[in-house]
């Protein structure tokens, strides 16, 4: 993108693939929008045998996490992005709910698509906590969701409610192997807090991201 203010889709595409594209486009050539760009996560998975995990505190099909597994002409193709998630074969996904989980209502929802592709679809915190190494491909949708079907801000989370750090710990537990793993972790709620000019929420989520990295 040549925009002075690019969006999450084009900037995440640049991070994930090394290619520029237009705002709103996820991992596609900006001129024709019909040539996909391979992501670093896809390369590590296919060429090096790495296990791959994707985590976001916002919707798991939001532009930034999607830029590591999806290829779409527009970031608004939420259902199709969810289908690509299931088809990626990546071993671990965790975060907020799909934005258009039911698509147009004529086919299986994104949870069903993932299950059909061999994923354990976990929607409770207890279920997530019970997962152990060897569980297989796993999709965790946070049990406690806020507006926009994203995870709660760290400052709003109830006592004992899983936050980003917990999903990172679980991801490391499930992905650890002799060949290595790649775990993309986004604290998308920092972005949402800044859009809302909510300094307190932003600070708490920055601290939560710091805890997750440590």
Task: Enumerate the predicted regions with their spans.
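Generic structural signal for bulky hydrophobic/aromatic residues embedded
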Residues: 18, 47-48, 144, 174, ...
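Cysteine endopeptidase catalytic domains of the caspase/legumain-like
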Residues: 38, 152-153, 157-164, 168, ...
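N-terminal catalytic scaffold of extracellular/periplasmic and nuclease hydrolases
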Residues: 1-104, 108-137, 207-210
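Generic structural signal for well-ordered alpha-helical scaffold segments
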Residues: 82, 169-173, 214
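Active-site His/acidic residue clusters
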Residues: 63-69, 145-158, 177-180, 184-213
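Short, structured patches in soluble enzyme cores that scaffold and shape functional sites
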Residues: 97-98, 143-145
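Active-site regions of oxyanion-processing enzymes, predominantly non-cytosolic
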Residues: 124-141, 167-188
């Amino acid at each position: 993108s040549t925009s002075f203010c690019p969006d999450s889709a084009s900037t995440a595409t640049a991070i994930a693939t090394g290619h520029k594209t237009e705002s709103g486009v996820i991992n596609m050539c900006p001129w024709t929008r019909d040539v996909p760009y391979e992501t670093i996560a896809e390369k590590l998975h296919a060429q090096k045998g790495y296990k791959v995990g994707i985590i976001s505190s916002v919707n798991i099909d939001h532009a930034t996490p999607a830029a590591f597994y999806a290829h779409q002409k527009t970031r608004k193709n939420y259902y199709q992005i969810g289908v690509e998630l299931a088809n990626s074969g990546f071993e671990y996904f965790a975060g907020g709910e799909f934005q258009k989980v039911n698509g147009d209502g004529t086919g299986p929802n994104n949870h069903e698509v993932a299950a059909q592709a061999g994923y354990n679809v976990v929607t409770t915190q207890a279920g997530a906590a019970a997962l152990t190494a060897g569980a297989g491909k796993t999709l965790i949708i946070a049990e406690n969701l806020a507006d926009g079907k994203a995870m709660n801000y760290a400052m709003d989370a109830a006592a004992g409610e899983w936050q980003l750090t917990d999903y990172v710990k679980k991801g490391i537990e499930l992905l650890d192997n002799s060949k290595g793993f790649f775990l993309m972790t986004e604290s998308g709620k920092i972005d949402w807090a800044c859009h809302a000019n909510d300094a307190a929420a932003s600070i708490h989520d920055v601290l939560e991201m710091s805890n997750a990295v440590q």
